[in-house]
Amino acid sequence: MACSLKDELLCSICLSIYQDPVSLGCEHYFCRRCITEHWVRQEAQGARDCPECRRTFAEPALAPSLKLANIVERYSAFPLDAILNARRAARPCQAHDKVKLFCLTDRALLCFFCDEPALHEQHQVTGIDDAFEELQRELKEQLQALQDSEREHTEALQLLKRQLAETKSSTKSLRTTIGEAFERLHRLLRERQKAMLEELEADTARTLTDIEQKVQRYSQQLRKVQEGAQILQERLAETDRHTFLAGVASLSERLKGKIHETNLTYEDFPTSKYTGPLQYTIWKSLFQDIHPVPAALTMDPGTAHQRLILSDDCTIVAYGNLHPQPLQDSPKRFDVEVSVLGSEAFSSGVHYWEVVVAEKTQWVIGLAHEAASRKGSIQIQPSRGFYCIVMHDGNQYSACTEPWTRLNVRDKLDKVGVFLDYDQGLLIFYNADDMSWLYTFREKFPGKLCSYFSPGQSHANGKNVQPLRINTVRI
């Protein structure tokens, strides 16, 4: 056992593990330093003996014990507590039938005699029972971590499967929506084409009928004119003066109805009606059937911060650097945020509008709950009733989520499109110049929504002085 082994490795003089062990002729072992100091103290007596058996030596020789030194070295390579705590109940070594230890560092069973101690020097070595408890605890922790990971992966897979099904369903629905939108345009174009061709045929028939009637009338008149000319030619061919003059009296009667003035009048065929900016003409006729048409929104002056200046038609807002306007405060008016709401509140339907943001370095646009707070400093985020995107730091764009979501905008925006499908809970922002997508809010809107505008503060150095302007499409 470990305790018995330790006793065998103790010097009987210093009661510590042998240091540089040597043997005497009586085969007792001591530390070289210990036995040397013992004999120094005996020099006055003139005799030197063994502290164990008291055998005296005239000229003692100290023989190094290499085997014992190796055993001490192997023993010292293992932590003392691990050796003392090793139990006889541990699985025996087949070669030595000795207690086994366990190296926690290498995760391996150890035999004191079989395994090289130097290989496990500075390792964490313990007894079988302690190792069992320690590894049981570690493995239970790992099992719990794996079970947690299994649950998280299962939930993630369930979510991905739902998203997969929803994406397939959404794609199918969107294919239908896109198909219906284009089919409606195709149908409208076909209807306009049919109507225009029918109108062309009607104009053609009317013009041709008029021309044909005039051709018939002028043909009849031409024959009479030719008959009159022939009568006159025959009379002029008469050389006998008496005969010529005798027929003059009846000549006027014969020429009656033979002479007609042309006075030809006609209308040009209306080709300009079917040429010119034909596509623009067709687009204008289709515009009334396009849905949604960019809404002609206006801003509500009663909600505007006193630093904001609105145009007479309430479609343009700018930050004023002069003193605040002497406006009457009310619960509707923003008192800290330089903002203004739209006049119209949305509670259903599909709507679209555009805002011109060119040459600005700061702005916020989007939607706000009609009941959202307008007093004090406001956090522009969905939990506060605001669904907006923002331009900040001169050239950065973000969605006002929690936290903000940076938008991938390649070129500076000049015009932003805002699309609201209230019933579907969709608010989508576009680059209105090419209708490229910017960001989508998906929400269950709890009440009426108003368009939201903030031009940001302008600066004395001329930055951000341009206004925000609602883009009104005029046809």
Swiss-Prot record:
Disulfide bonds: none annotated. It catalyses: S-ubiquitinyl-[E2 ubiquitin-conjugating enzyme]-L-cysteine + [acceptor protein]-L-lysine = [E2 ubiquitin-conjugating enzyme]-L-cysteine + N(6)-ubiquitinyl-[acceptor protein]-L-lysine. A zinc finger (RING-type) spans 11-54. Transmembrane segments: none annotated. Disruption phenotype: Increased susceptibility to fungal infection. It comes from the Eukaryota. Keywords: Coiled coil, Cytoplasm, Immunity, Innate immunity, Metal-binding, Transferase, Ubl conjugation, Ubl conjugation pathway, Zinc, Zinc-finger. Polyubiquitinated, autoubiquitinated in the presence of UBE2D2. SMART domains: PRY, RING, SPRY. The keyword Metal-binding applies. Pfam families: PRY, SPRY, zf-B_box, zf-C3HC4_4. E3 ubiquitin ligase that plays a role in antifungal immunity by mediating 'Lys-27'-linked ubiquitination of CARD9 downstream of C-type lectin receptors; leading to CARD9 activation, followed by activation of NF-kappa-B and MAP kinase p38 pathways. E3 ubiquitin ligase activity is dependent on E2 ubiquitin-conjugating enzyme UBE2D2. The RING finger is required for ubiquitin ligase activity. Belongs to the TRIM/RBCC family. This is E3 ubiquitin-protein ligase TRIM62. It comes from Mus musculus.
